[in-house]
Amino acid sequence: MMKGLLKMGLLLTGWAMLLPIVGQEPGTLDTEFQDGGMLLLAPFGASSFENAQDVIALEDGSIVFCGVVGTVGNFEVAVLKLDPEGNLDPAFGVDGAYVFENDLASDQAYSMAALPDGRIVVGGAMGFGGADYSATVWCLLPDGTPDPGFGTEGRFQYTFDDGEEYIRRVLVTDTHITMVATVKVPGFSYDRIGLVQCTHDGVLDQGFGQDGAIIHTIDDTTDLSVRDGERMSNGGIAVCGYHYNMTDNTEYPFIGLFDAAGQPQAGFGNGGIIIADNQPGEYFAMATAGDILYFAGRTNGDVRDFMIDALHTDGTTYTPFAVYGHFELDNALTDLILDLVIDEEGRLLASGTSGIPGFFGDRDFALLRLLPDGTPDPLFGTDGLTTTTFGEAFDDANALVITPENKAVLVGMSAQTNNDFAIARYILGPVIDGVEESVAQFSVYPNPTDNVLHMAHSEHLTEWSIRTPLGQTIEAGALDQSGQMTLGLSHIPSGAYILTLETPHGPQTQRIFVQH
């Protein structure tokens, strides 16, 4: 990951620059998808509530998403597949959907992933009545039918304790499925961290944790509500969420680190857990890039804004990111990040919601893109942010995925009648299918650089400029000859910049990174 930062001497010579065609600006809705890039889907009738919680992309451009359908007190796990145009795939499940019917109680689905052989696993909880929920993974064949060779009747279930247990994230390795869960103390409202691991066939891995699983917290009355988890570069597991402090009635972010065997990371925080008790807020999502961990959610207190923190795997702040490792953005009365991914250039893409707080507040889908240094991408949406409304009600984008065609698909819910599945697809750019090529050829190296930047070009280029991501011009000049030019950048602060070259074919841009 972070390829744009780690690869020295990025060579562009001989490569025809790809320019998006008109209407394909990064951060805009993809008009080739359904109704101008948007889809409201309610295939289970007007009385059903639908809510999409996670999504994966397949190689052919289709997507599969999971969530719940049904009525209050009787929600069922549902998995649906859409073709690249956004239509239900009739060859998947029954008319494009698999629904797990359980008459005992409601079920929940929060996370999904693809196994190496194309099977799909969905993590959540199966209800047995009252407060009895067991951590459950459903496994489907590529055609949307349960895998009879996985666990019992296509399900793996694990009971941590006698209370409510919900899998929040399924993490797939070459041989195992690791589940990150919230585990409640029976009879109490305290949450704890739960980890459990099984094979790709749904068999408990007895060598993980303590006989296959672990429940972990700081003490019996410390509430730790888990919301996400990721594998780290060292094979360990990072989890995040929020701690509810009953003394001041405030949530605070927390992170927990475990080794690959499911044991708390020695020397990290308090038994492998750090609570940011000086920073009110909540983590709902995380992503990793090399040895850097990114945690996202919202601030808490008088304002609730988009928030992302960057840390090293030892818990120290990754200071080159944003403002001393911390990013905040105030767009509306309430702003919340619910999912986070990192693209191949090291940029952060976050989905969530923005608008008026409260159950009936008018909120919109939100899609945010940051450069690797934690500044909003000025070439994306409006100052790095795009919002999309499905109507005058709340629209929450619970998850996103980047497709092989370099498009972002956001899934969630929209409360227009009852809650409906809400899906939107956006252009990220450049678009590989349907591009205009320019014959301008040049190279920029080394990139990143700590001192000088060389520009080699094959034709007459008239002007150049270096701007900050927010558009402030740092340097500018004229190019009066073809060949090569060297710029001294030792006086420019470390960070990401936009290099623009004026050519007979129009302006060409390239991100450059200065690292002193």
Where are these regions (language model features)?
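Residue-level detector of functionally pivotal "anchor" positions at catalytic/ligand-binding pockets or at interdomain
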Residues: 427-445, 457
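Short beta-strand segments within Ig-like beta-sandwich modules, predominantly Fibronectin type-III
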Residues: 476-481
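C-terminal tail/sorting-segment detector
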Residues: 494-516
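Extracytoplasmic mature domains of secreted or surface-exposed proteins
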Residues: 24-433
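Bacterial Sec-dependent N-terminal signal peptides
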Residues: 1-25
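Short strand-edge motifs at loop-to-beta-strand transitions and within beta-strands
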Residues: 483-487
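Short coil/turn motif common to extracellular beta-sandwich-like domains
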Residues: 447-453
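Short, glycine-anchored, charge-dense loop/turn motifs used at functional sites
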Residues: 466-474, 497
